[in-house]
């Protein structure tokens, strides 16, 4: 079993049911000294940033779910890469698999993407100031390439 820290659309129970159906939620941890951003492909990533914190959902993945989630995140194609990073949940430090975008160049979100992220943040009761930060990103003009689809 692997712990996975989700900070974007993978926080959503519905999204995870599609891409890692056996994933089990463990809790709501924080990733310290990182910031949330939207990259040029219109989806989320995190990047090192002192004194900032990213909140998300910790999922327990089976080996099979890890493979299907890696395919969805386009690890083989190089869109994201995997890293093991420390997250803190209820005062406990745990290492978790985190997907980081290869490109850290900021851009506007894909149309509809931040709606999924914000709904998931509300579903998991992430801190309201953090949700407001996410909402501010959703106010940027969305990319018109195509609407976000997670199925």
Label each PLM-derived region with a short phrase.
Residues 1-151:
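Glycine-aromatic micro-motifs
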């Amino acid at each position: 079993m692997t712990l996975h820290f989700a900070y974007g659309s993978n926080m959503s129970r519905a999204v995870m049911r599609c891409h890692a159906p056996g994933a089990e939620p463990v809790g709501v941890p924080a990733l310290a000294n990182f910031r949330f951003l939207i990259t040029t492909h219109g989806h989320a990533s995190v990047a090192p940033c002192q004194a900032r914190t990213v909140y998300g959902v910790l999922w327990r993945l089976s080996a099979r779910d890890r493979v299907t989630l890696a395919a969805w995140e386009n690890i083989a194609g190089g869109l994201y890469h995997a890293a093991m990073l420390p997250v803190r949940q209820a005062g406990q430090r745990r290492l978790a698999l985190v997907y980081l975008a290869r490109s850290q160049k900021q851009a506007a979100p894909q149309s509809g993407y931040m709606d999924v992220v914000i709904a998931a943040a509300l579903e998991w009761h992430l801190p309201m100031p953090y949700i407001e930060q996410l909402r501010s990103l959703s106010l940027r003009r969305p990319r018109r390439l195509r609407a976000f689809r997670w199925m």
